[in-house]
Structures are given as C-alpha cells and as structure tokens.
Amino acid sequence: MIALLILSLTCSVSTYRLQGFTNAGIVAYKNIQDDNIVFSPFGYSFSMFMSLLPASGNTRIELLKTMDLRKRDLGPAFTELISGLAKLKTSKYTYTDLTYQSFVDNTVCIKPSYYQQYHRFGLYRLNFRRDAVNKINSIVERRSGMSNVVDSNMLDNNTLWAIINTIYFKGIWQYPFDITKTRNASFTNKYGTKTVPMMNVVTKLQGNTITIDDEEYDMVRLPYKDANISMYLAIGDNMTHFTDSITAAKLDYWSFQLGNKVYNLKLPKFSIENKRDIKSIAEMMAPSMFNPDNASFKHMTRDPLYIYKMFQNAKIDVDEQGTVAEASTIMVATARSSPEKLEFNTPFVFIIRHDITGFILFMGKVESP
C-alpha cells in the first residue's frame, strides 16, 4: 500500500479570490517528482503574488491567470490575503511566523507610487555588488530567525532585485504520541521494506474513507494544540492519483467529510529537507516574466527587469510532540542588458493546513523517512 501524508497549514474556508492563490501552490507541488518532498505552496504562491503587484502587460496577465484573478479583483485579493495572514495567530502551543522582504539595487529607479504603497511590507535598497549575501541574510535572520537563507549561487553581480519570503511553523500535537510506545516497525515502499521508528497513539480523531474516481483513500486529521492548524494524512494504493486530484476546493470538501472515530494511529517519525531550483515550475505558469524581451514590472520601475532565478528551501521534522517546519522562497531579477545565466509501512503525502483561510503553507511526500 502506498501512503500519502499531507501536512497542510490551510484555511478551510478560502474566499473565492484566494482559491486560485492556494491552487497555484498546489499545481507547483504537483510538478515535483522526488521521492521525499517538503514544499511550501504558500511560500511559492506568495512570491508569485508579490511579483504580480508590480507587473504589467503580458506579465501581469499571466500572473493574474496563475492566481485565477480578474484585474479588478487584485486589490480586494491583496486585502483578503493580508487579512488571512492575521488569522495565522501564534498561541502558547503553536508558533507561526511569516516574513516578506523585497531587496532592490540602488541603481534601479523605483516609482514613488509603488514605494509609498508597499515599502511598509519590507522594501530595502542596497548594492548587490557589495556583500549583498551577508547583508540580506542579516536582515532576513533578524526578522525571521532563519539563517543563511541566500548564498552566492542565488545572488550574483547581475542581481538587481530579490523577493524573499519565509515561513516558520512550530506546533504541538493536541493529542501527542506517547514516546514510550514508539517502536521500530516495517515501512514498505517501491524499493522494498525497511525498519523505521513508528510512533503510536490511541485517541479520538476526525477521519474517513474518501473516494476519488472509484479509488479509496483513508484520511485522518491530526490537530495541533490551541490553533486552527492541522496535519492531514492520507494513504491508499494510488497516491499519484490522489495528488493529481488535490485542489483547494477538494481539500475543503474532504475535510468536511471527516467524522469522529477512535484510532490506533501509527505514524513514522520523519525529517525531510529539500533545496530546489523552482524556476522551471514557475516558468510554466508565467513564462513572460522570465523572458528578457517580454517581462514587465512597470508598476514598480521603468528599468527592464526580468526574473532569472527562483528557489525554495524547505525542511520539516515530525516527532511524538509535534512538528517544526520552515521554508524560504527566493525570486531573483536582473535587467535585460545583463547576460542571462542559467543554473541548471508505505510512502505518503503531507499538507500543513490552516483550518480557517485555505492557505497551504507546506505539503510534501515521504518515500523513505
């Protein structure tokens, strides 16, 4: 049997304007083919959304389509996004922190209207040819606590603009696993069977068997203490089909189908860390912003900027007490005149989900914990 773990920090009642925001991150996730995956759909979508605000022409049209937004909905969607972020509250047992930084080279002329509207969200001026990596890492670490978010492979002397967002989540299970009951047990995947530390808890949880095109999957919700955040776990024989079926609306629908049951739940402890170049994924959704001849960010500057790099670093640790997960998404731009450089038991899926807004902060797949 193949298992899917969805660690989802999402809001179950997404407004129609933000469903496309969530779906953009899900589509990006579906284009990742690794065995073990941890990814932040929220981090990806947030970077794309913040690049939409200064975009114009075909670049704006493509990004609006990516977010499934009409032009007149952009302002209200931004307001709803900021409102949704306010609902990701930190409590005694759960800590959620999100940051956004836009670093623009001193040589780029920013329009006063753009600066006035967005500087309060974290707009910085610097010289990318003078120790930019250390300066940016210092600012990001001061704001987020995350260190060494960027390196010299991400930024170079051609860089003129970098958009960086971070997300950090730490949650304690509402129903913790008893550490004294963790035992070595078998986990079977396509490569064979291995021994892993398997956690165990007997408690009442919300779960159900859901059916997708005659395929059945067992889904269970593991809530975090004192927060509207849950981990959803799903397991079945065809997890590729399950992943292909995921949308923001379907996650809402499936979550409403879950009922209270007493489970003897066994889940392996696991840690995953991924560092990936996601430019090719974003390029499929909004190709013009990566094209030196077609990109346009004229709502921010008349300089001929285009995106030439995009990365996401993410990691997650799941144990008997709860979950710690973090991700940073980095989008890097240069000017057209610069030479372009190209930087080339069973498996399960996880989604970390805020149960009020629909934002998917993390999702992934574990083939070998």
Curated annotation (Swiss-Prot):
UniProt-recorded Gene Ontology molecular function terms: serine-type endopeptidase inhibitor activity
Induction (record text): Expressed in the intermediate phase of the viral replicative cycle.
Localization, UniProt: Virion membrane; Host cell membrane
Disulfide feature: none
Pfam families: Serpin (PF00079)
Record family assignment: Belongs to the serpin family. Orthopoxvirus OPG040 subfamily.
Assembly and interaction partners: Interacts with OPG185/A56 protein.
Protein name according to UniProt: Superinfection exclusion protein
Source species of the chain: Vaccinia virus (strain Western Reserve)
